[in-house]
Amino acid sequence: MSDNHRLDGKVALVTGAGRGIGAAIAVALGERGAKVVVNYAHSREAAEKVVEQIKANGTDAIAIQADVGDPEATAKLMAETVRHFGYLDIVSSNAGIVSFGHLKDVTPEEFDRVFRVNTRGQFFVAREAYRHMREGGRIILTSSNTACVKGVPKHAVYSGSKGAIDTFVRCMAIDCGDKKITVNAVAPGAIKTDMFLAVSREYIPNGETFTDEQVDECAAWLSPLNRVGLPVDVARVVSFLASDTAEWVSGKIIGVDGGAFR
């Protein structure tokens, strides 16, 4: 691996890293030499398994519980990271929740539940990352391809919560320039995780009777590469954005959907 792609000597924090895309990101950053904080909200056992995998690959890691929908908890998470490893270089904000509901049925409680984590949570993750991070760091948020390129029925709350991230990134990249910190986001499409499989039929017209195999076929059909996206596909892009190679990339939203929406 090119030295510019290595992360030796770096400390990375990944939120929502107990499973799915977040877990893949944490492992990938560790494989490139970073020490990793695996943040989780509820899935302690899963997070500890991610830590074990990172350590088995030759670097250090620790799991820290925090609800990143709570700004005070986020601040404590960052401070604990710095206390444990001495400093902080990379923050990958991955915690998120999905929601479906027709406009007429969305309650204020559901709206607030989604925006608390997906939008407000990511904003304050970025704020605390800036406050705790060394000069030249990397902040990588998570948007969605439904945020800017594709309208999905009954998906306004989720898509809107992610659409704000695109604006955050463009503005935060300017604010963070004084510390030479880059700010970018990945915007995944259909990525095969347990969360996606739980809700994927909502994306497919009349898809409620589809088997998992049929869902995979639909997702693969959307991409000219004719396969389903995997968590490692997102992790590789995050690893690039975290590296020295991406020093001149900031304020960008990188689609990771295999060309599904062009």
Swiss-Prot record:
Keyword line: Cytoplasm, NADP, Oxidoreductase
UniProt-listed Gene3D superfamilies: NAD(P)-binding Rossmann-like Domain
Gene Ontology molecular functions: versicolorin reductase activity
Domain of life according to the entry: Eukaryota
Residues that, per the record, bind NADP(+): 21, 67, 94, 127, 158, 162, 191, 193
PROSITE patterns, alphabetized: ADH_SHORT
One GO BP: aflatoxin biosynthetic process
Oxidoreductase is among the record's keywords: yes
Residues at the active site: 143 (proton donor), 144 (proton donor), 158 (proton acceptor), 162 (lowers pka of active site tyr)
SMART domains, alphabetized: PKS_KR (SM00822)
Catalytic activity: (4S,8R)-2,13,16,20-tetrahydroxy-7,9-dioxapentacyclo[10.8.0.0(3,10).0(4,8).0(14,19)]icosa-1(12),2,5,10,13,16,19-heptaen-18-one + NADPH + H(+) = (4S,8R,16R)-2,13,16,20-tetrahydroxy-7,9-dioxapentacyclo[10.8.0.0(3,10).0(4,8).0(14,19)]icosa-1(12),2,5,10,13,19-hexaen-18-one + NADP(+)
Keyword match Metal-binding: no
Record-linked SUPFAM superfamilies: NAD(P)-binding Rossmann-fold domains (SSF51735)
UniProt EC number: 1.3.1.-
Pathway given in the UniProt record: Mycotoxin biosynthesis; aflatoxin biosynthesis
Induction: Expression is stimulated by gluscoe. Expression is regulated by the atfB, srrA, AP-1, and msnA transcription regulators. These factors bind respectively to the conserved motifs CRE1 (5'-TGACATAA-3'), SRRA (5'-T/GNT/CAAG CCNNG/AA/GC/ANT/C-3'), AP-1 (5'-TGAGTAC-3') and STRE (5'-CCCCT-3'), present in the promoter of aflB. Zataria multiflora essential oil reduces gene expression. Expression is repressed by curcumin.
GO cellular component: cytosol
Localization, UniProt: Cytoplasm, Cytosol
Function field: Cytochrome P450 monooxygenase; part of the gene cluster that mediates the biosynthesis of aflatoxins, a group of polyketide-derived furanocoumarins, and part of the most toxic and carcinogenic compounds among the known mycotoxins. The four major aflatoxins produced by A.parasiticus are aflatoxin B1 (AFB1), aflatoxin B2 (AFB2), aflatoxin G1 (AFG1) and aflatoxin G2 (AFG2). Within the aflatoxin pathway, with the cytochrome P450 monooxygenase aflN, the versicolorin reductase aflM, is involved in conversion of VERA to demethylsterigmatocystin (DMST).
PANTHER family reported in the protein's UniProt record: NADPH-DEPENDENT ALDEHYDE REDUCTASE-LIKE PROTEIN, CHLOROPLASTIC-RELATED (PTHR48107), RE15974P (PTHR48107:SF7)
Protein family per UniProt: Belongs to the short-chain dehydrogenases/reductases (SDR) family.
Name of the molecule in the record: Versicolorin reductase 1
Species assigned in the record: Aspergillus parasiticus (strain ATCC 56775 / NRRL 5862 / SRRC 143 / SU-1)
